[in-house]
Amino acid sequence: SNGLSRVLQARSREKILIVTDARKELDAGLPVRDFLLYVMSTRTLLGVVSESGNFSLHVASQMRLTPATPGERFEETSIGSLSENLRREIENDFPLLHANALVGLWGALEACINDLCLLWLPCMERQELGDALEGTRVKLGEYLSLGEEEQWLWILDQLQRSDGGSLRTGIGQFESILKPLGVSPSVDSAVRTTLFRIKAMRNLYAHRAGRADAKFLKEWPGHPASVGQIVIPTSNQIIAGYTAMVLYVEAVHGSMQSKLGTPRSLPEPPPWINSVEDLLPMLEPNPYVPEGAPWSYHFSHDQQDRDSSEDSAASSV
């Protein structure tokens, strides 16, 4: 009995340490910090690519004026071919780069919310945690075979599986987990709408190579794309997306802090926008809907013009 008592005491001390560590990390907002760093890295990457692309195109235009070999066509050189591809990317606002950024940003958002929940679970009252788990199938043997930290991850996984949150639209994916955990942040309607549409676009590139389906067009009424056509993410849409993500993550963290007795002021918009009201106009779709995908020969604006010119020339012969 003394041995059992020592084991139970050791486990009790271990639980206290885990709760204390979780509370410290939650107070410090470490998952939020990591997410903000991801957003800033994405902003930097998109900015560097755009600026470098425009500068490289400027250099290429100067080289066009002074060819290295007299009589050589600039378009036939390696630099000329590269600059032509670069020009298409710039004119079309780097569509595939923005699409990949969108998928990555949503994945980082999911990871941030999961990490916040994992820190929140040990801080909950046991009665609240029991209520949250009501209705889930708990395999006691599987649960007890795990270490303390793994048990929290297992609990979160069970909650996510039982609710099918990943199939929900917009931030419903996260609210389906947060609400049972007693976390209900106040979310501005503009932020909610932005994340609803951004997730719909993200799903297209995660599962359909960017091609619109009926579900997307229902979630984004008025979008110029038709079923089967490519949905082009604009730079403004990406900015609106990660801005709304930042505001949402800060709201979730603030709600957790309030429940723990350390309330925080409502999150303010990041410095690159004036107010949340700026988000919805930034979601305006690109009116141009290409015939092909960003990686196809027929994607560029100028390809349609070139085909028209060739058709006109052929008809005049």
Residue spans of the language-model regions?
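Polyanionic, low-complexity intrinsically disordered segments
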Residues: S1-L26, L30, D34, T44, ...
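Generic structural concept
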Residues: V32, L36-V39, R43, V103-W106, ...
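Short helix-loop boundary/capping segments at the starts of domains
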Residues: S41, L45-F55, N114, L118
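N-terminal low-complexity, intrinsically disordered segments
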Residues: G53-E75
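Helix-loop junctions and short alpha-helical segments
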Residues: T69-F196
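Hydrophobic/aromatic-lined pockets within catalytic cores
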Residues: E110-I113, C117, L121, E125, ...
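Short amphipathic alpha-helix initiation/capping segments at coil-to-helix junctions
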Residues: D188-I198, V231-T234, I238
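Histidine-centered, metal-coordinating catalytic motifs and their short helical/loop contexts
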Residues: V191-L217
